[in-house]
């Protein structure tokens, strides 16, 4: 140890000895540890601009492996001091002031301007029975400036850009992407590292995150000085966003759904005939057939494999589809031929793959034998369909093996990972007691899309470097940008008020540091315009939505019947 380091440690020891309230403070290589309010607390610099605060109840300190944060603490020069009863830690970017008696933590910029306060006595651990495992409800309160504007919280359908003065229940569902992350106009962000359903509350008294289950209070303070700096910090902490291939960033045609290879290819033909630019087309659901065969990850619908009339395959005909409907003699007779035809037309193709499986599928049987099915009601209801457990690495292996063998090896370009919340029908509280590889579903619920996208991205990257990964998915969580994941705002309706809400939703989502997002142009459900597509108001709505769509990373038309 050199003399300079020895002097610093001696000075620190003198501070502790002189200050009774700091006697339980221990210096670490990047911060401090101390006990306060019946908790063990760690304050650690991950970089000059990122600080992690980690609190555990009781006398035993434990750590956790984050699903979101991939950055390891970097060597950061930190100076230590004291200010009355408080201990101070300073990097070249920020200063942190800790009161070991009250548990309060204050964050300042290098000029001494207060940025955020972790409130005195603001951490609460309430014992909670997590499906038989002793745990806690965890609540953490902060103090913001009265007129401070904050963004983030994922993609919400409130129409609010400023996320102050409201209460939100953060549990991923269709149209609502829930990320416990706030981005302040003052040039900092706060990420609450908890994956369970969480209530965000902001009122004149405090701003808080209240999570249903957790073993710790764990958050990251990220200072950037401005929005670009904050986003750079978020990606340093949780992963960079890969650059997509150019063909992804254009116009995509999609609908619910194309019912045969011929229909899909004829749409591509029409765009080329009209000389309207088209970069890609998307095959939606039921290429696998009926609901019992849901998401088999195989082309088993007889219309896709030229097997109409064959008893072996007619059982897979989609529910409600007329087996006697005459589509004529098929021009495109196989999935491989369909994909090749799209490529010959200088376009790309994406396909829908879901996070659940029907009871007839080989995938259902494999996941069930692995105990990797989540047994609650999902879409489509009353068909025996169950979501899989993406937290289980073996389940992610099985998932990709089927995608590769049955679809990717045919030449498929991109993936539409639908229903990655996942869809949850007839919700019951006990559903969240369902066990996953990482504990109760309640404990890890909001990280479902992160883990599902992780599996596909990492496996495709391991399979080949010749084709960049492109994932379109309906749900998301912080860190998902590192998996080449692009989200859209779900099954929104064709209304001016709904279009307006997407503006706020997309801006707040992007300010979480995740750049790739779009919305269904014109709305997915037409609702009051059903059977009235010639309505001039409907036309005007589409025109305006398409004009906005030009400026979204992906311009995608996707509508239901």
Question: Across the structure, where does each feature detected by a protein language model lie?
Answer:
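Short N-terminal segments immediately surrounding and downstream of signal-peptide cleavage
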Residues: 23-37
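Bacterial Sec-dependent N-terminal signal peptides
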Residues: 1-24
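A low-complexity, Ser/Thr/Gly/Pro-enriched, surface-exposed linker/loop concept
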Residues: 25, 29, 44-87, 125-128
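Glycine-rich, histidine-containing beta strand-loop boundary motifs that form or position
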Residues: 45, 55, 91, 98-100, ...
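Catalytic and substrate-binding clefts that recognize carbohydrates or anionic sugar/phosphate headgroups
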Residues: 82-248, 254-257, 261-263, 268-273
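Short, surface-exposed charged micro-motifs
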Residues: 24, 40-42, 79, 95-97, ...
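Aromatic- and carboxylate-enriched substrate-binding clefts and catalytic-loop regions
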Residues: 280-561
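Catalytic domains of carbohydrate-active enzymes, especially glycoside hydrolases
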Residues: 266-286
């Amino acid at each position: 140890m050199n003399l300079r380091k020895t002097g610093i440690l001696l000075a620190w020891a003198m501070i502790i000895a002189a200050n009774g309230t700091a006697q339980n403070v221990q210096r670490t290589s990047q911060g401090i540890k101390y006990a306060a309010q019946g908790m063990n607390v760690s304050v650690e610099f991950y970089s000059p601009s990122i600080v992690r605060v980690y609190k555990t109840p009781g006398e035993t300190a434990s750590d956790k492996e984050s699903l979101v944060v991939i950055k390891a603490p970097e060597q950061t020069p930190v100076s230590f001091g004291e200010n009355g009863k408080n201990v101070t830690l300073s990097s070249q970017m920020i200063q942190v002031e800790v009161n070991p008696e009250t548990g309060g933590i204050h964050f300042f910029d290098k000029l001494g301007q207060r940025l955020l306060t972790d409130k005195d006595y603001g951490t609460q651990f309430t014992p909670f029975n997590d499906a038989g495992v002793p745990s806690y409800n965890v609540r953490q309160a902060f103090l913001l400036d009265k007129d401070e504007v904050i963004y983030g919280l994922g993609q919400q359908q409130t129409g609010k850009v400023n996320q102050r003065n409201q209460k939100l229940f953060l549990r991923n569902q269709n149209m609502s992407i829930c990320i416990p992350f706030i981005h302040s106009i003052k040039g900092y962000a706060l990420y609450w590292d908890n994956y369970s359903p969480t209530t965000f509350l902001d009122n004149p008294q405090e701003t808080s995150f209240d999570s249903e289950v957790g073993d710790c209070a764990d958050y990251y303070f990220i200072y950037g000085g401005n929005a670009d700096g904050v986003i750079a910090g978020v990606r340093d902490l949780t992963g960079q966003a890969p650059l997509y291939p150019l063909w992804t960033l254009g116009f995509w045609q999609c609908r619910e759904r194309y019912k045969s290879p011929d229909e899909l290819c004829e749409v591509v033909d029409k765009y080329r005939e009209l000389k309207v630019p088209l970069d890609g087309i998307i095959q939606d659901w039921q290429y696998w057939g009926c609901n019992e065969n849901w998401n088999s990850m195989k082309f088993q619908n007889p219309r896709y494999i030229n097997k109409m009339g064959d008893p072996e395959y007619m059982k897979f005909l989609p529910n409600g589809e007329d087996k006697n409907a005459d589509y004529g003699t098929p021009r495109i007779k196989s999935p491989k031929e369909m994909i090749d035809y799209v490529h010959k037309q200088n376009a790309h193709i994406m396909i829908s793959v879901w996070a659940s499986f029907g009871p007839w599928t080989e995938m259902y049987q494999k996941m069930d034998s692995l105990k990797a099915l989540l047994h609650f009601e999902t879409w489509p209801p009353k068909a025996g369909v169950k979501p899989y457990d993406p937290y289980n690495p073996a389940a992610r292996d099985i998932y990709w093996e089927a995608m590769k063998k049955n679809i990717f090896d045919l030449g498929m370009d991109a993936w539409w990972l639908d229903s990655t919340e996942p869809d949850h029908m007839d919700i019951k509280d006990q559903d969240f007691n369902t066990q996953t590889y990482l504990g109760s579903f309640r404990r890890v619920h909001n990280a479902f899309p992160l883990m599902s996208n992780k599996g596909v991205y990492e496996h495709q990257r391991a399979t080949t470097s010749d084709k960049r990964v492109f994932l379109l998915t309906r749900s998301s969580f912080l860190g998902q940008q590192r998996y080449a994941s692009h989200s859209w705002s779900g099954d929104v309706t064709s209304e001016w008020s709904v279009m307006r809400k997407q503006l706020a939703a997309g801006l707040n989502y992007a300010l979480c540091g995740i750049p790739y997002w779009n919305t269904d142009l014109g709305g997915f459900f037409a609702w009051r315009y059903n059977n009235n597509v010639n309505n001039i108001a409907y036309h005007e709505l589409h025109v305006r939505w398409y004009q906005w769509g030009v400026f979204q990373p992906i311009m995608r038309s996707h509508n239901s019947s």
